[in-house]
């Protein structure tokens, strides 16, 4: 078998046939109207779903700090984390993760997954109406979502530093059942109790 390779870091390509590669999955906790802060949960797991580390970081509701917070999580474990998998692009309301900047800061490929039917244009309209933050709008306008098939389900993805074929293979290998991989499902479950 010839392994699929993603060349993301000099002299450190990822052999996707190895179930031991580690992913950092990230999702946010729910929050109530009027709250200033929320949390993101990061889970480091092997491609086969074996969980090795759980962490959290505080983010500002509708702020601009989520890219930095995720980057800090990833850089603490840069020697082992090979792919960052995000549940969506927006955390803590409209705290938008700039996946291209996240890839630049960490050198780690980023896969941002969301349900079919999610729309950046709807987020842009809401941000224009409520926040008027052109930086967030610029990030959203640069996205190029693609459809991926996972276990017969269509899910959407935005990618940085990784090709769609490699992203699709990682998602399939990290999915135990259903349409979403463990790197999205597990942080979501943990974040719900915060």
From Swiss-Prot:
Domain of life: Archaea
Pfam families reported in the protein's UniProt record: DUF99
Range of residues in the leader sequence: none
Similarity comment text for this entry: Belongs to the UPF0215 family.
Protein name: UPF0215 protein TV0037
């Amino acid at each position: 078998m010839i392994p699929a390779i993603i060349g993301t870091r000099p002299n450190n390509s990822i052999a996707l046939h190895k179930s031991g590669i580690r992913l950092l999955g990230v999702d946010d906790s729910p929050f109530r109207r009027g709250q200033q802060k929320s949390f993101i949960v990061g889970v480091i797991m092997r491609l086969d779903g074996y969980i090795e580390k759980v962490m959290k970081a505080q983010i500002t509701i509708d702020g601009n700090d989520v890219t930095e917070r995720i980057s800090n999580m990833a850089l603490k474990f840069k020697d082992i984390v090979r792919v960052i998998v995000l549940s969506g692009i927006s955390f803590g309301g409209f705290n938008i993760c700039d996946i291209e900047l996240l890839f630049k800061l960490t050198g780690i490929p980023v896969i941002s997954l969301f349900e079919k039917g999610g729309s950046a244009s709807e987020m842009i309209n809401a941000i224009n109406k409520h926040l008027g933050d052109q930086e967030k709008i610029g990030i959203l306008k640069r996205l190029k979502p693609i459809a991926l098939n996972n276990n017969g389900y269509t899910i959407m993805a935005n990618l940085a530093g990784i090709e769609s074929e490699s992203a699709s293979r990682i998602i399939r290998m990290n999915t135990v059942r259903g349409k979403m991989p463990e790197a999205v499902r597990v942080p979501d479950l943990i974040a719900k109790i915060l």
